[in-house]
A protein has these predicted regions:
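Terminal amphipathic alpha-helical/low-complexity segments used for targeting or macromolecular assembly
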Residues: 1-35, 52, 59, 73-77, ...
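Short acidic capping loops at alpha-helix termini that bridge into adjacent secondary structure
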Residues: 34, 96, 114-115, 130
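Flexible, glycine/small-residue-enriched loop-and-beta-strand segment within the central core
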Residues: 37-111, 137-138, 144-146
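Beta-rich strand-turn-strand
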Residues: 102-126
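Short-chain dehydrogenase/reductase
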Residues: 117, 133-135
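Short arginine-rich
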Residues: 127-131, 158-159
Length: 165
């Protein structure tokens, strides 16, 4: 183990690398597929209060400062008024081959279909069909994945010239 990894391990523990964080989440009972990568894992917050309520598929990429929640604490306001704890929770399902952009928030009850891109800073609620690109607050469909692939192909040469200047 190199010096950098040793420092990360001492400072961030199980969040010091993508592999360690994924392994730890699995040990808590979370279902996580193969080839899942957490970029800057120490900045990613994945709710482990009920780990069985979050499912992450294969080939999922979650970037820095993202949060995935399967519950909330809004009941605290109602408890103050009524004395009742009216908790709220919901499954979170992230399909296969999904990219979640930086600083996105995946809320309880969210379901992200296969082959989906979530733009940076998005708030995901409810069901998002697969083979699509979503962004915004709340996340809305921007385009089909096929249209986005064609757009990226068309821009590839133009953007490549920026790299060689």
């Amino acid at each position: 183990m190199g010096l950098k990894q040793l420092v990360l391990q001492l400072v961030y523990g199980h969040k010091s690398s993508s592999e360690q964080y994924v392994s730890w989440l699995r040990s808590q009972g979370m279902h996580i597929g193969q080839h899942v990568h957490l970029y800057t894992p120490w900045s990613i917050k994945i709710d482990t209060q009920r780990p069985w309520m979050i499912e992450i598929g294969d080939n999922v990429h979650i970037t820095a400062d993202c949060s995935i929640l399967q519950h909330d604490y809004s009941w605290a306001v109602m408890q103050h008024l009524t004395g009742e704890v009216l908790g709220s929770c919901g499954m979170v399902r992230i399909g296969n081959n999904v990219f979640i952009g930086q600083k996105s928030l995946i809320l309880k009850g969210a379901e992200i279909g296969d082959n989906t891109i979530i733009g940076a800073g998005s708030v995901v609620t409810g069901h998002l069909e697969g083979n699509a690109v979503y962004a915004g607050v709340p996340a809305k469909k921007i385009s089909s994945l096929d249209v986005y692939v064609d757009k990226r192909r068309n821009l590839q040469l133009e953007e490549a010239t920026l790299l060689v200047r």
